[in-house]
């Protein structure tokens, strides 16, 4: 089975709409990266219904650690930096998108995270 994981910073106290927008940015950017490096995973994910899991971290440090580990594993990913036009400071790191890729590959990095 394939999935995509989106990891959101919970400490920024973004509103629900802002959080949803950041998750969408992370999802789309990771998907575009996956198209370039893992087209078979993208095809499998599309055929299986495009499962997404949204998880949380509580600091920028935790978010960067996830992003580092995702890159070490060679998974398609994205790191989202907010423009700062609305609720949070410009340049704030808000989310990481991972995949689509096989669930077991993503869970190597995300297994200890809680659902948002």
From Swiss-Prot:
Pfam families: PTH2
Cystine crosslinks: none
UniProt-annotated location(s): Cytoplasm
GO CC term (a single one): cytosol
Domain of life of the native organism: Archaea
Family: Belongs to the PTH2 family.
Protein name: Peptidyl-tRNA hydrolase
Source organism: Methanococcus maripaludis (strain C5 / ATCC BAA-1333)
């Amino acid at each position: 089975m394939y999935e995509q994981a989106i990891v959101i910073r919970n400490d920024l106290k973004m509103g629900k709409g802002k959080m949803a927008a950041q998750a969408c940015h992370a999802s789309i950017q990771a998907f575009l990266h996956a198209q370039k490096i893992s087209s078979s995973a993208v095809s499998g994910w599309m055929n299986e219904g495009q499962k997404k899991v949204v998880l949380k971290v509580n600091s920028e440090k935790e978010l960067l650690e996830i992003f580092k580990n995702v890159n070490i594993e060679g998974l398609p990913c994205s790191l989202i930096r907010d423009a700062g036009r609305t609720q949070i400071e410009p340049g704030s790191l808000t989310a990481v998108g991972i995949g689509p890729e096989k669930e077991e590959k993503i869970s190597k990095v995300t297994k200890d995270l809680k659902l948002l």
